[in-house]
A protein has these predicted regions:
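Beta-sheet entry/capping signal
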Residues: 239-243, 268-272, 286, 325-327, ...
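Conserved C-terminal RecA-like helicase domain
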Residues: 311, 343-368, 372
Length: 504
């Protein structure tokens, strides 16, 4: 449950793909064409013989009657259909122009080099300042007013029903979904929602050689930065439920961002229960190491031998040298590669590296870690091996968290989320980024002790866990855990580890 809000945020966001706009235009044409053929047809003057043209016009006439009936029921006109079709076609052209301009500005050689395999968001407004997006402004300049946006869902529904009727098939159509997203784009506010062009790696050999569509896929993305109301509305559909995790605190933040306060405001009872760790405290050693803050400014690039990097390798190697399997979590896969290489030079035991991969490779790596003698597994704290994995028994003797795994704050969508949370809570960075990062760190060290008879070592390696400062995170660790994670200096870590080993 601790990841409910960040994971659901994507599910309650919308997007309309370039290809979907293309397909919606095609579907609209299939509905419009019989109406125009029926209107333009005339009596040939000789009904003694039936020609191919006659049969086409007869079929078009029958289809036209069916479509007119659907239009009448939905209060949608032929003019609405034609206007929405023109809007989608022009919108696709505008998307094409903007993607081309973006690639020309950021990667002038993109036509020759192809995709750089990097997905990105191209913001349509300043992410830090809520305001009208550039697509909405373009539409107004192009003469597309409220009507074309607001009637898009009804037009999409008519297209679906009409094509079902005249095609006599049970196909899935694009126009309804496009219409709903287009309407949401128009009516949703500009603080809760952030609008951008989503550009992703793709390969389409049928696209023109000089088109970005050959190597990229683009969509108009409507990101929900504050999904609490949407989550609350969905939770309200249930008679009751339990949201459970060992890392929900701080509870006031969790209640707000997951929609529980939204439910409570509607009169639904929301009850909190907190349970301590039932295992003997003498079986676990928990340390918050006062090492230099593992920020990019302090540590430098992975190839640099800075004092900060040296301190982290030294401390991590001390823990990793302990008997048993050791899990090491870093803020990113790039840092994981660096740490794994550094540990291989220091340790006698095998060092396994988890890289961003598919489920099969991850399961294979996990099996290798569990089999045989003592090993070290280095991974990203944003991966899947630091939470939700069973390390019970002798599978894990220690876990080390290096730094606070705060996500990239330069990404446009992240900056928009921070700005939205700033306006809701006044502490957007802490609510949107710091609290989830600390939860991930706590999840990682929580892999160690899974039963009453297990012993293990838990290490939070960063001064921000150890002592108060302007950007510390110690206050986001629950009080009962803060008492256990006693601050130690890097020099005293080895002594503390030896004392714990002797106590067993």
């Amino acid at each position: 449950a601790h990841m409910l809000e960040p994971r659901v945020r994507a599910l309650v966001s919308d997007r309309v793909a370039d290809a979907s706009l293309r397909d919606a235009v095609t579907e609209l044409t299939r509905v419009i064409q019989p109406l125009t053929l029926s209107t333009d047809s005339s009596d040939p003057g000789d009904d003694s013989a039936t020609t191919g043209t006659d049969r086409t016009e007869t079929a078009a006439g029958a289809d036209a009657e069916t479509i007119r009936a659907e239009l009448a029921d939905a209060d949608v006109t032929l003019e609405d259909l034609e206007r929405v079709r023109a809007f989608y076609a022009d919108l696709r052209d505008e998307l094409d122009r903007r993607v081309t301009d973006h690639l020309d500005a950021t990667r002038p050689d993109w036509r020759a080099s192809g995709s750089d395999e990097t997905d990105r968001d191209v913001p349509l407004r300043d992410p830090t300042e809520p305001g009208r997006d550039e697509i909405s402004a373009w539409a107004e300049r192009a003469g597309y007013g409220d009507r074309v946006w607001t009637c898009a869902p009804a037009v999409g529904a008519v297209v679906e029903r009409a094509l079902d009727a005249i095609a006599d098939t049970d196909a899935r159509y694009t126009a309804p979904g496009v219409g709903r997203t287009i309407a949401a784009w128009h009516h949703e506010d500009h603080t809760t929602f952030f609008r951008a062009i989503r550009l992703e790696d793709a390969h389409d050999e049928t696209a023109p050689a000089d088109s970005w569509r050959r190597t990229h896929a683009a969509s108009l993305a409507l990101y929900n930065c504050l999904p609490s109301a949407a989550i609350g509305d969905r939770l309200a559909a249930f008679g009751g439920g339990v949201l459970m995790s060992a890392t929900l605190e701080p509870m006031d933040v969790f209640r707000e961002v997951t929609g529980l306060d939204h439910l409570a405001a509607q009169g639904r009872p929301v009850v909190e229960q907190t349970h301590g760790l039932p295992f003997p405290p003498e079986n676990r050693a928990s340390f918050a190491v006062d090492a230099p803050k593992f920020t990019h400014a302090n540590r430098g690039a992975p190839g640099e031998e800075t004092e900060t990097r040296l301190a982290y390798v030294d401390a991590t190697a001390r823990v990793a040298a302990c008997d048993g399997n050791v899990l090491v979590g870093t803020p990113s896969y790039t840092e994981a590669r660096w740490m794994a290489t550094a540990l291989e030079e220091r340790l006698d035991k095998p060092v396994l590296l988890d890289e961003s991969s598919d489920d099969r490779e991850t399961e294979s790596l996990k099996a290798s870690f569990f089999e045989g003698g003592d090993k070290v597994l280095v991974t990203s704290l944003r991966g899947t091996l630091t939470e939700g994995v069973d390390y019970s028994g002798d599978r894990l003797a220690a876990a080390v968290v290096c730094g606070v795994p705060i996500i990239n704050t330069e990404a446009p969508r992240t900056r928009a989320v921070i700005a939205a949370y700033d306006r809701r809570f006044s502490e957007g960075f802490e609510t949107a980024l710091t609290v989830p990062a600390v939860r991930k760190a706590r999840q990682a060290v929580g892999r160690v002790i899974r039963g009453a008879d297990e012993r293990g070592i838990r290490v939070l390696l960063d001064a921000r866990y150890a002592r108060r400062s302007w950007n510390d995170v110690r206050g986001y660790v629950p009080a009962h855990e803060r008492e256990e994670f006693q601050p130690v200096t890097p020099d005293m870590l080895e002594v503390a580890l030896e004392q714990f080993d002797a106590s067993g």
